[in-house]
Amino acid sequence: MTRKIFTNTRERWRQQSVNNAFAKLRKLIPTHPPDKKLSKNETLRLAMRYINFLVKVLGEQSLHQTGVAAQGNILGLFPPKTRLPDEDDRTLLNDYRVPSPGPSHGAP
C-alpha cells in the first residue's frame, strides 16, 4: 500500500511538472487573442512553427547585415533588396499575430 501511495505521488508530481512546463511554453508563444488557452498539441505545433519563423528571421537579419557590410565595401551606397516573407511566414503572422522583432529586439 505504501508503494502505491509513493508511486501515485511521484506520478502526480511528474504530471504537475509537465503541466508547468507547458504553461511556461504557452506564455512564450504569441496568440490572438493573447489569453487564448492552447491544448498541449497546439502548444507544441505552434512552438515549432514559431521557432522556425524566428530562426528564419534571425538568419535573414544575419545575411542582411553581412550583405550590407560586403556591398558597402564593394558597391558603395547601394543597399540590398528587401525580400518579401514567404507565404508560410505571412500566414503565421496573420493567423497568430506574431510581432516582427524590431532592430532593438533582444538587445541588452
Curated annotation (Swiss-Prot):
Pfam families according to UniProt: HLH
bHLH domain residues: 2-54
SMART domains linked to this entry: HLH
InterPro entries (alphabetical): bHLH_dom (IPR011598), HLH_DNA-bd_sf (IPR036638), TAL-like (IPR040238)
Ranges for region Disordered: 76-108
Regions that span the bilayer: none
GO biological process: midbrain development; multicellular organism growth; post-embryonic development; thalamus development
The protein, known as: T-cell acute lymphocytic leukemia protein 2 homolog
Species the sequence originates in: Mus musculus (Mouse)
